[in-house]
Amino acid sequence: IDTTSTRLVVNPGGTNEKFVVEHIKQAKIRVHDNNRTIFDEIIKGRADVMITDAIEVAVQAGEHSALCAAMPGKTLSFQEKGFLLPRDLIWQQFVNAWLTQRQGEGYLAEVFNRHLNK
């Protein structure tokens, strides 16, 4: 991927651009400001690759038959996402209890699978 002939597209700011700046030294990097149309850059042949979160790769590959994941099931780095809530102990406890219950029931895995395996 990191060759002078590769055209890489990335959304501005955040962890995707940070990863690209830190690790990609030779590819042609173009920042694309619109997160809704960035995937079209690859589909229409204006970019060769995009580095993004694994969950987004799975979702977009499922929604666009012209896209596919490289190294499915593997990632370039480790990153966990979290929930940020307003400071409210009762709400926090409710959300934590709900997530714990849903995770234990297998509901979260079911939702991810349903949306990723369309």
Q: Where do the model's predicted regions map?
A:
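Proline/Glycine/Serine-rich low-complexity intrinsically disordered segments
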Residues: 1-118
